[in-house]
Amino acid sequence: SGRLKGMINHQLWEKLFGGEKNIFLIEDVHNPLIRMGNCCFPIPGDKISGFIFEDKEIEIHHSNCKNSFNKKNKVPVGKIPVEVAWSISEKLTQQHILHIQVIDGAGILYQITKIIKDAGVTIINSETAAKQNNYADIRIEIESITWPVFHKIVEKLRPLKFVKKIQEEASA
């Protein structure tokens, strides 16, 4: 972070990192300067790590993602590792859209919607589309809920064998 600190003026550094702690707090997942890793799709509540690119964008990964920075991985060229943490109110509610890529099969939509229903959350809309190579895309719009409730739903969906990718889309 020493190199990065030299690149940013002192007042901006204090505002971004809160002094000498060097932790970037993420308050908005839809901030255009923040991009979520396309490999692991972290959401608030996940343990995360991050990189700052030379263009000042911050890329966030699960802390256990193969592309995250840890003592075993070398830092990729053009990336500066930075400590990151979620700073999103646990009381903030918002509508969420889940985009789930699955291996297609019987009963998959039922299993996914059951997890959402069991969390006490209402599904507003859902769309499915069959893709090539036995894959399907499922898009589910759910009612306004807090990030912790959303995180619990995603944590129950991630381990399902047929789920290949889950991400949260920005709702309109």
Predicted features along the sequence, with ranges:
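A glycine- and charged-residue-rich anion-binding loop/surface
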Residues: V154
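Extracellular/lumenal glycan-associated surfaces
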Residues: K114
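N-terminal non-catalytic structural scaffold regions of very large proteins
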Residues: S1-L109, D118-A119, I124-Q132, E141, ...
